[in-house]
Amino acid sequence: MTTHDTPLKGRICLVAGATRGAGRAIAVQLGTAGATVYVTGRTTRGEPSEVGRTTETIEETAELVTAAGGEGIAVPTDHLEPERVRALVDREHGRLDVLVNDLWGGEHLIGSAFGRKSWELDLADGLRMLELGVRTHAVTSHLAVPLLIRNPGGLLVEVTDGTAAYNGTRFRENLYYDLAKNAPIRMAFGLAKELAEYGGTAVAVTPGWLRSEQMLASFGVTEENWRDALGKAPDFGISESPVYVGRAVAALAADPDRHRWTGRSLSSGHLAAEYGFTDADGSRPDCWGFLVAKETGTPAVADHR
């Protein structure tokens, strides 16, 4: 491989929340670009997290990063525990070039919550969503950013659900989920202001309708036959594989002019149009454009892929 093939060779990345889904794909794509990638999560081969899935582990993610051409290093970490995050940061070669906050793991809390008023929900579950989706990001940034700013050009990516434009005028069906997914957008905006004097860049990035392992399981399909779900959910045709957002973050990390995006809320579809990459199947889904168009008409999925 040439340096053109591995533009991130020699870079140190941390993907916090990389057990599965978007986080795993981001880590693998950073590895494909040649980076050393620390991957964290709570599910290990010896112990599952509260998510309750044992089919994906943080060790497996690290192995996938290495197989892709990078160096994957698994560090089991609960990002609600500051001391464990501090120990993680202390391991990172004395430098950090890319920090990706993809911390969540609250899907098991939202299944019965959508469509219900906030006061009808279990308060402990609602507050747990905020712990998992907001506090984890705050703890990790607080402890990792001092390492990120040691060298100019650091990149911080807050992964969330929805763009600022979309979420800003739409309620995400559940108050606690809405708060958990809008907070990272504001974190990216605020951190962009704070990182500016150090030459750092902070952005929020969202996938579209993500064909994560859990989403595929909910439809009873796999990545190979996901279109079988279109009979009961035609709009699932606008969905995207995790590879798409992984390529989006890798493209940002490799862009020497990435600071032009700082403080902004970006989507995988937007970045695909900018950088010219595609999803794994060669398509370029634009989920958020499709959803906006659907509010005023009946758009064809094919027009947004």
Identify the function of each model-found stretch.
Residues 5-44:
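Canonical Rossmann dinucleotide-binding motif of NAD(H)/NADP(H)-dependent dehydrogenases/reductases
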Residues 11, 70-71, 95-96, 148-162, ...:
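Active-site loop of short-chain dehydrogenase/reductase
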Residues 33, 190-200, 256-259:
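Active-site-adjacent segment of SDR/Rossmann-fold oxidoreductases
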Residues 55-56, 76-88, 123:
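The beta1-alpha1 cofactor-binding region of Rossmann-like NAD(H)/NADP(H)-dependent oxidoreductases
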Residues 105-109, 117-123, 149, 153-197, ...:
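Catalytic loop of short-chain dehydrogenase/reductase
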Residues 141-142, 189:
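A short, exposed helix-loop element centered on a Lys and neighboring polar residues
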Residues 204, 224-305:
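C-terminal helical subdomain
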